[in-house]
Amino acid sequence: MSQIHKHPIPAAIAEHALITPEKYQHYYQQSVQNPDEFWGEQGKIIDWIKPYKTVKNTSFDPGHVSIRWFEDGTLNLAANCLDRHLAERGDQTAIIWEGDDPNQSKTVTYKQLHHDVCQFANVLKSLGVKKGDVVAIYMPMVPEAAVAMLACARIGAVHSVIFGGFSPDAVAGRIIDSHSKLVITADEGIRAGRAIPLKKNVDEALKNPAITSIKNVVVFQRTGNASYWEDGRDVWWHDLIKEASADCPPEEMNAEDPLFILYTSGSTGKPKGVVHTTGGYLVYAALTFKYVFDYHPGDIYWCTADVGWVTGHSYLLYGPLACGAITLMFEGVPNYPGVNRLSQVVDKHKVNILYTAPTAIRALMAEGDKAIEGTKRDSLRIMGSVGEPINPEAWEWYYNKIGNSKCPIVDTWWQTETGGFMITPLPGATELKAGSATRPFFGVQPALVDNLGNPQEGVAEGNLVITDSWPGQARTLFGDHERFEQTYFSTFKGMYFSGDGARRDEDGYYWITGRVDDVLNVSGHRLGTAEIESALVAHPKIAEAAVVGVPHNIKGQAIYAYITLNHGEEPTPELYTEVRNWVRKEIGPLATPDILHWTDSLPKTRSGKIMRRILRKIATGDTSNLGDTSTLADPSVVEKLLEEKQSMQTPS
């Protein structure tokens, strides 16, 4: 294929890199051959109150799945992210906050953050929150969201952060499932110039009669627009901290005490409350952050993720703060008020490391050079991609345009359930190939298996499994260990099943091919939708594409492609033929789309993932039950797609 673009390690990166190719080989071998020795040493990246003696105690055996790391050690996460830095870098910036409005920004030092966290931890105690209680956090992207999370960790409460874009029903469901005792929210959030009615959504959610555990709602004042107020239940953040002491000793926590619950949608049923514990998670978040981003003291790091997603937990807050880093928190979106906003923020704050998602990259790519207009971006040293496989064209555009053809891209594959990076390049140790997540991180043992669980050696394609545990691994699903075993360990016995497919090339590099339910079987041949989408998006007139399979009476499945064109382009019969021939040329006749569906927008969740389940149903005409659409950023897109489908004259 024309899309395999190799990029060597730049000399400027190699010179100062924390991990070289030789070090990677050495550490990786040690980490899989002697995990106790390797992780016993690496566990020291954080401070322990009582040091651990036992490192790894894990089992993936059917019916006995149990994951424990550093289980006899004790620590406090907030002390690791704050207190231990005060002597050396108390006056250093911990968080740079950039508002939705380009004229609003501020910095918070480690000393200030420590003070605010201690105060708010005492507020939580005064409201009756105890060690082990669950606190729901439904906040905008403001430093107070970090304060709330760290304050929970300081006193041993378990936080359940709910993304600010979720509906009242979704909020209610998460509060009920987790038995949350308290809700922390804001009057409103601000995103792309629009107000998000957070408090109103909480009020609506709390009308659910099944919610009996909530005593108080703490409200942070972001805009000053809180309409409804329930005396006795609702309390202002600013009123509470006025009275609060800034002296709050950190609670001593066992390594296996729960740190947070984070809900993630399953392919079936209600969202799953993924549980991460304190010790192994923090060791893994800190170690992966340090080495994957090749973090050097003083680097300014920007992860564009919201705190409501696992990326926001591990790589906006906990990983960076545990390492004493400077982390940038952005309230806005990459293309507001202008399409060059992301580039402007990079220049304004002299960002050295940028971590964002393919969805954002593709949206900017559709704007062409306008996305970098009037900016230099010459402070950038490392860039990263997260959330879904990045197609080689978007990778190259990101590399050449945003990164001025000099920044290695760490294309990271991982999941809510893995806690941290699993397969990823290391800037000073890995030659890059556009579109490949490359190699496993230390201690991660991936394998490819066929549908019967037989290992596929060498160059192969198959289901991506992990054969042994790692410290950042989720321990269970909240209140449902049976579902945890069923979801992740029953498909392939004795292995963690990721739900993703991958192929391994001749260099041992992994290429994620998409969810396994996004695999097409055309005339007995397996085709990953990501591969076809990649070819489509490589066409100069196409901005975005999503591919699904529809039943075909001869081939088994036909290929149905939803396509969004770049601004200014119009669909024509000529373009229809041209696009089909283009894919035929890029991948081969088998991959030629049978049906093209032109559309202005695709149904996406608020985190930017394309909702393929809905696209499959629309494509097959099965619209009787589209399932839960509450997580869609814009539900009206579905109606539009249905209308388009009805009016389509598809060539047979």
From Swiss-Prot:
GO terms for biological process: acetyl-CoA biosynthetic process; acetyl-CoA biosynthetic process from acetate; chemotaxis. One of its GO terms (cellular component) is cytosol. Signal peptide: none annotated. One of its GO terms (molecular function) is ATP binding. Pfam families: ACAS_N, AMP-binding, AMP-binding_C. The keyword Nucleotide-binding applies. ATP binds at residues 387-389, 411-416, 500, 515, 526. Its EC number is 6.2.1.1. The modification N6-acetyllysine is found at residue 609. CoA binds at residues 191-194, 311, 335, 523, 584. It catalyses: acetate + ATP + CoA = acetyl-CoA + AMP + diphosphate. The keyword Acetylation applies. HAMAP family: Ac_CoA_synth. This is Acetyl-coenzyme A synthetase. It comes from Yersinia pestis. The gene is acs.
